[in-house]
């Protein structure tokens, strides 16, 4: 009987091995066949930057990234910027550049591990966590090779795989708060501690390496590079405080043209300068450019042409429902009640914001104030409470009216005043204070404003000009829009502003200085207007 039992047991084992072997050969043949089939390389791959010189328009951002990663003490980094401007490409290149530096701690074998926060999922039971790591659970996931013996099986996550290198988390702003808190702990400890109810330090059957992992943790000494399209204030302060913040800006039309030209050259086609101009008007980032050119090149190749026509570009734009990127420019001549304000949107992108005001003297009744184009109310949560208040932009307008009354005795409530900020994007923030004050002052006194001056700054009830944020981006936006002077708060002044070419940066501390610089046909001496009525022509 024993002989028969052994015979049938060996026969069954042989049959199982034979079946597994046949299945293995069959699947390997399928896999080899699949791998032998390859399509042509897409243009998105061909046009991907292979060196920092190919990252267009991000000279300052790349310089900051190199300074943070390529020194003897590399830092954790968060890169802010709009989509398709080179954040991911720069992150991929910076590790290879750091390896070439003599004083860099990154070894030649240092790995670049990339993970996308938008698709990152984890299990609350701790049995699946591709970022931090997990422990195989024999109940939920099957026994596995060691599960029969009751031995837990640790699975390293991305933080351990990136040990000694760089962990790149794309769209880090979308990372789940629980995962983010786990990541913060790993950044502090530089190791990962796992836990399992199956682990016992007294178990003599426990393999040494598993005991070492549970007792002393998995190594996770890496440098984090996160990329996000969110604003800094939308990122949890705990992660921001541990990282150097690097900003990539939006691309200018001439930079879009350069990217388009390079992409077209890589597919072996030609295009006219006017065609490049059209592309630069309808694309705002490199990804949009490449997608548009892929379709245009497809049309040209199907029609057996070696060039892309303007009609090809226009057809793709029309069918792809591309929206023209409006480039804000200063007005051609001074206008009463129209002022060039400045704002910041997205990730440190500056924009010229035309503010227009009309004022009409009322008789027999009080005037009315109308405001359009701004956020009037805002709601936010704080300490488990929902708080609703007037927006900072609307409050800034109230400050302006009070300041004009206090300083110049302008009775704004005697006028029907309409303040409008065109553009279709609701505006918030106090930094348009001096621009709104100048526009109201101009409209009431019927005096034009210098159209070549742009301005930004908060205004107090006493007419003092307060500091604001995003000054560098605003100055560049003013220059790009055609302004030759930009007024900023004196508290934001930096000696580096003297190095800007093509635009003069003027610091001011009170609203009188602003009016003296911007209102045309106005005496340069101290102004003491007693009544708006007596001064209006």
Description of each model-found segment:
Residues 37-80, 400-405:
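Pre-Walker A (pre-P-loop) alpha-helix and adjacent loop at the N terminus of AAA/AAA+ ATPase modules
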Residues 69-120:
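Walker A/P-loop
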Residues 100-134, 139, 201-203:
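AAA+/P-loop NTPase substrate/partner-engagement loops
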Residues 101-107, 232-238, 245-307, 407-414, ...:
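Conserved C-terminal "switch" segment of AAA+ ATPases
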Residues 122-132, 154-188, 195, 232-241:
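Conserved AAA+/SF3 P-loop NTPase catalytic/coupling segment centered on the Walker-B
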Residues 136, 140, 178-217, 237-238:
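Conserved catalytic/switch belt of AAA+ P-loop NTPases
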Residues 293-294, 299-329:
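Conserved C-terminal helix/linker of AAA+ ATPases
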Residues 339, 361-537:
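Peripheral, non-AAA+ core regions of ATP-driven protein-machinery
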